[in-house]
């Protein structure tokens, strides 16, 4: 089968190749997914550049990307919660990374059935970003009536964090650019801050949680608005 592989660390244009590789071998608790859509995330860029070698040592060549949606075409002997033909999506574990391929083997505990009202492409865009948003807010102890500042509300993680925070009953501030103000409001944010024309530090004074995926000065400035 064909798969996109990271063949060396460095600039993206020099580091990737579509290669012919063996179809994955299933373990007892795995399912084999025929890939219909896959997604890339910022972490994939940093892996390619070699910035994460100390934290994520990966033998090369290696498959790339974690998000996938598709159809189950085979399953292991110990898989009882899925059937051949199920439409599914997943954020695959580190050791099974490599979703930009014709097929990917995934442990069944990391797989969910795809909602019928979204496309394969939409489903593939959700898992890693969605889990990042959900797990971060849960770790922060989000609860109803919390005031939450979510930076970069129009990003993949931020847009999902807004929706999850609202579902938990929080009041949501978010920052975004002028072009995305209307869309972010439609996601449910209570106060949208256009960072090109407004300074969020003059608006947010009493946040219970600051959700920051940007880093740099935003991390240190968070203490000014809590």
Language-model segments: residues:
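Mid-domain Rossmann-like dinucleotide-binding core that forms the NAD(H)/NADP(H) cofactor-binding site
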Residues: 124-194
């Amino acid at each position: 089968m064909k798969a996109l592989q990271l063949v060396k660390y460095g600039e993206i244009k020099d580091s990737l190749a579509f290669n012919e590789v063996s179809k994955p071998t299933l373990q007892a608790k795995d399912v084999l997914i025929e890939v219909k859509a896959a997604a890339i995330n910022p972490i994939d860029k940093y892996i390619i550049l070699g910035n994460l070698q100390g934290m994520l040592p990966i033998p090369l060549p290696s498959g790339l990307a974690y998000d996938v949606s598709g159809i189950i075409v085979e399953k292991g002997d110990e898989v009882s919660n899925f059937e051949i033909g199920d439409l599914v999506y997943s954020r695959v574990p580190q050791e099974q990374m490599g979703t930009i391929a014709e097929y990917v083997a995934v442990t069944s505990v990391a797989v969910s059935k795809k909602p019928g009202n979204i496309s394969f492409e939409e489903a593939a865009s959700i898992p890693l970003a969605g889990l990042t948003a959900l797990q971060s807010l849960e770790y922060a102890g989000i609860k109803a009536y919390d005031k939450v500042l979510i930076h970069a509300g129009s990003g993949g993680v931020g847009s999902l964090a807004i929706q999850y925070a609202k579902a938990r009953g929080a009041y949501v501030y978010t920052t975004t650019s002028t072009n995305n103000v209307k869309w972010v409001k439609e996601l449910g944010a209570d106060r949208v801050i256009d960072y090109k024309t407004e300074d969020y530090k003059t608006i947010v004074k009493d946040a219970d949680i600051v959700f920051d995926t940007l880093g740099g000065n935003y991390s240190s400035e968070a203490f000014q608005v809590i």
